[in-house]
Design a protein with these regions (language model features):
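Local beta-strand/beta-hairpin segments that build beta-sheet-rich folds
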Residues: 23, 132-133
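Amphipathic alpha-helical coiled-coil/rod segments that serve as protein-protein coupling scaffolds
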Residues: 2-127, 141-145, 151-153
Length: 153
């Protein structure tokens, strides 16, 4: 899902892992910085919405007594709608960045035994890379239904 440098291998070859168990930790400093930056931008956008909301309330009273023009009120209302859209956009960007941060920890898709480690600490993995990072061998019980005639007994 994301690319980066492998900081830690969180298992030993030949050990049993459960589905969802963390296997690798990518360097997440960039992802953390992105989340922090986008969170600050979101707070600025929310503050702008609050400012424009207060201004609109004031302008609503002023436009009724012709103290300001209808055009000025409409412009402020348009700015307010744009600011609300900016907040929604920043929430989506922040959500995506938080997801990227979560994906910096690579988990096992299935339970099984780690058969082979294909990347080591310090390796660079790319987003969309189709190569496996480790081989998890699923070791399950196998049940066989066999029909046997009484004469073969």
């Amino acid at each position: 899902q994301v690319g980066g440098i492998v900081d830690k291998v969180l298992f030993k070859q030949g050990t049993y892992v459960h589905a969802g168990q963390p296997l690798f930790k990518l360097n997440s400093e960039i992802f953390q910085a992105d989340v922090k930056s986008n969170r600050a931008t979101l707070h600025r956008a929310e503050a702008e919405v609050t400012r424009l909301q207060i201004l609109l309330k004031r302008y609503a009273e002023l436009v009724t007594v012709n103290a300001i023009s209808k055009q000025e009120y409409n412009n402020t209302e348009a700015e307010y709608q744009k600011a609300k859209a900016d907040v929604t956009q920043m929430e989506a960007i922040l959500s995506r960045q938080q997801l990227n941060l979560k994906y910096a920890t690579i988990t096992s898709p299935i339970s099984g035994i780690i058969g082979e480690i294909l990347v080591t600490e310090g390796a660079l993995v790319s987003q969309g890379d189709t190569k496996a990072m480790a081989v998890v061998q699923q070791i399950d019980k196998v049940y066989i239904d066999e029909k046997q005639s009484i004469t073969d007994y």
